[in-house]
């Protein structure tokens, strides 16, 4: 169910224990509630015309506890604040290049002009993990990320099974041609949100997850 995404950003989760209706109502508006229960994880490719990667096999059922997940990708503005509070470790968290949505000016990290509400990109896994801890949250597991993206009806894309277009997802855009216009603000493209209301689960930037992948 993957659509090509560029670079690395992050979203975060909070896990709930003993979830109740009151807990569902008492969290920030910028997070969405993902209920407990099973979902079908993975995607089986039966021919070359289908979406997906071979490493998405085998299809299997996973049961998750309830959790909250960020509705939006982390912005360049918010990540710059984190870096400024951890400047000694910042080089381990991100490498500032002309293709990154933040810059380092006069001893301070800041979002590039006009990109304040765009997703942070080119973040290392260590930077993503440290930022989540700084916020009192954590990275989602791959299973948590996929359920938040696809829901429980085995859809191919966050919005359903319809072919991707640029009203739903940053589709077939190249940084070499478009520069930062390859991305969109984190709260844009509402037609492409997931069943739970999470934005840009199939576009903008890649997101890190907590667990690691063994191709062997």
Where are these regions (language model features)?
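Functional-site microenvironments in short loops/helix caps that host divalent-cation chemistry
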Residues: 34, 40-50, 103-216
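Generic short amphipathic/hydrophobic targeting helices enriched at N-termini
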Residues: 9-11
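C-terminal motif of bacterial Sec signal peptides marking the signal peptidase cleavage site
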Residues: 17-18
């Amino acid at each position: 169910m993957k659509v090509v995404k560029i670079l690395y950003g992050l979203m975060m989760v909070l896990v709930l224990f003993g979830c109740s209706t009151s807990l569902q109502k008492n969290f920030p508006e910028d997070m969405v509630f993902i209920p407990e229960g099973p979902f079908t994880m993975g995607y089986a490719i039966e021919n070359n015309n289908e979406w997906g990667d071979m490493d998405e096999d085998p299809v299997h059922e996973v049961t998750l506890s309830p959790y909250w997940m960020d509705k939006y990708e982390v912005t360049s503005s918010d990540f710059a604040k984190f870096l400024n509070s951890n400047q000694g470790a910042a080089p381990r968290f991100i490498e500032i290049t002309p293709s990154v949505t933040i810059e380092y000016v006069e001893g301070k990290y800041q979002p590039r002009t006009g990109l304040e509400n765009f997703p942070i990109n080119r973040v290392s896994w260590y930077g993503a993990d440290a930022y989540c801890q700084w916020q009192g949250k954590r990275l989602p597991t791959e299973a948590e990320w996929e359920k938040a993206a696809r829901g429980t009806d085995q859809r191919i894309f966050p919005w359903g099974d319809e072919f991707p277009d640029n009203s739903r997802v940053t589709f077939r855009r190249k940084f070499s041609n478009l520069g930062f216009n390859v991305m969109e603000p984190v709260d844009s493209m509402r037609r492409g949100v997931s069943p739970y209301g999470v934005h840009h689960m199939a576009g903008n930037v890649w997101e890190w997850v907590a667990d690691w992948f063994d191709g062997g």
